[in-house]
Amino acid sequence: MDLIGFGYAALVTIGSVLGYKRRGGVPSLIAGLSVGLLAGYGAYRVSNDRRDVKVSLFTAFFLATIMGVRFKRSKKVMPAGLVAGLSLMMILRLVLLLL
């Protein structure tokens, strides 16, 4: 079972709900829940086959790119820098699973 992947998905999902409660942005909530569900699906696939990282890798790369750009613009570590950093660590972990 890919506990790290499921934890990453849970953090993204919970973060989107907390961000919605704080700021009230419905598009951010929908995007965050969608990415969280996609990350959860990717973790499920990795749980069944450790080399099936395509969905998880795509999701982490997408989130790292989006949040990396937001971090570069805003210079705020929370939440953009934190999510970009976690996504980069997920990418590294997934690539290492392929080796």
UniProtKB/Swiss-Prot annotation:
Keywords: Endoplasmic reticulum, Membrane, Mitochondrion, Transmembrane, Transmembrane helix. Pfam families: Tmemb_14. Its main location: mitochondrion. It comes from the Eukaryota. InterPro entries: TMEM14, TMEM14_sf. It is found in: Mitochondrion membrane; Endoplasmic reticulum membrane. PANTHER family: TRANSMEMBRANE PROTEIN 14, 15 (PTHR12668), TRANSMEMBRANE PROTEIN 14A (PTHR12668:SF11). Inhibits apoptosis via negative regulation of the mitochondrial outer membrane permeabilization involved in apoptotic signaling pathway. This is Transmembrane protein 14A. It comes from Mus musculus (Mouse). The gene is Tmem14a.
